[in-house]
Amino acid sequence: MADKLSSTDAMGCWSPTFCFISLISSSTSELPLFVVEVGIAAYSLEDPPAILSILVLNALEVSSFISTVKKFAFCATKNTNNNNSVVMLKILAFLLLEGIIIKLFLY
């Protein structure tokens, strides 16, 4: 797990798991630590929907959601020729979809 968290590709982009941790580390005061741990575990099991349900908790705050999307977009587009970027693009697509759903039903 430690290798997965700290690994970078040839272009120096972090692994999706590390990006996930860095995304929510800025808002850990808002989220219980166990939620962060569950998110990391979910990603380790390669279960993106479980991660997204956790990210949606953070996305309920619009400014935080926009920041999250921007960070995922940056990591996803930094190097489009590797598997990490493909995973990031998929998560970004789901985040955008979740953002639309949240906007439709909660605002």
Swiss-Prot record:
Keywords: Membrane, Transmembrane, Transmembrane helix. It is a multi-pass membrane protein. The chain crosses the membrane at residues 20-40, 49-69, 86-106. It is found in: Membrane. Signal peptide: none annotated. It comes from the Eukaryota. GO terms for cellular component: membrane. The keyword tRNA processing does not apply. Partially overlaps YDL010W. This is Putative uncharacterized protein YDL011C. It comes from Saccharomyces cerevisiae (strain ATCC 204508 / S288c) (Baker's yeast).
